[in-house]
Amino acid sequence: MSPFKTTDNPNEEEWELAHALRSDGFPYDRMGYLDCLGINWMALQSEDLILPFALGRSKWGFKQAFCPFGAQRLGPLGRAADDPERLREALDALPRLLRLRLSMSRPTGWNADRGWHWRKAGWERWYSAPNYELRLDGSYEALHQGYSSQTRRNLAKASGNQLWEYSNPEELWNYFVQNQGGKYAIPKGYEQAMKTAMYHLLHQGRGAVWAALGEGNQWLAGIFVAFSGDRALLLFSATTPEGRESNSMTWLINEFITMAVGRWKVLDFEGTSAEGLARFYQGFGAVNVPYLRWERWNAPWQLP
């Protein structure tokens, strides 16, 4: 008999206890945050591990388990969160849906990436997704020494005539749509979900919005940072053309780093497949700490 059970009504108290046992806590592992995304949630649970996932339908109409936008990686939680064998057992115990595509933290010792292969009556694969993190140990001066020469030049150009101010999710989202919205496919419902999630974290004291303002209080760049344990996570950002010209995002993140040193241990820039963004994060000394993506198609005759 499997030690795992699937529940469509996760116990929030149990979930919080499991979250507390995880060495790296992420804001989107908490049920309060996940509920803001407006998704139907389920979890695979045992005594020592919880694996959350969203349940929905694809654009072709079939049921699937997935991780939505706004929750880059979900779990695993619990004492066995870093045990690769237990994670493999959990993945095998997931409901027999046609498609499963999950993102999660990569346990220590997880096997190397593997392309599509046949396993237990289904095709599956797992691969590493990039995620950039900056350790905030030590002094700001030491961190600054780790900046790339390009980042230091951009920072020198950006200094002066910029102010650090609190902003709000509505303003940040509007500037994102105006200036970056055409570059990205924004899923239906994502706007309301992301705003709700940001306001939830603000009200919980687990997030803040900051902006760089130029002359005449001109809005140049903004970031939303979520806080979870020892981790500060750059969840959302936007910049204007004027902000790009004046290197305002470089200035704004540097200002955040000066404040964050001694408060958190990690600044998590989140993942990106865009080479330009990756270089930007690496310019502050961030290194790639990949997470795990797993995808499976079950054979139709295995479906309930």
Located regions from the model:
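A conserved beta-strand-loop-helix scaffold within acyl/acetyltransferase catalytic domains
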Residues: 2-47, 52-61, 112-244, 283
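Conserved acyl-donor/pantetheine-binding loop and adjacent beta-alpha core of acyl/acetyltransferases
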Residues: 57-73
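The substrate-binding groove and active-site-proximal loops of carbohydrate-active enzymes
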Residues: 72-80, 242
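Extracellular structured ligand-interaction cores
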Residues: 73, 99, 129-131
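Aromatic (often tryptophan-rich) hydrophobic motifs at membrane interfaces
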Residues: 86-92, 196-303
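Conserved beta-strand-loop-alpha-helix junction that forms the acyl-donor binding cleft
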Residues: 102-112, 269-277
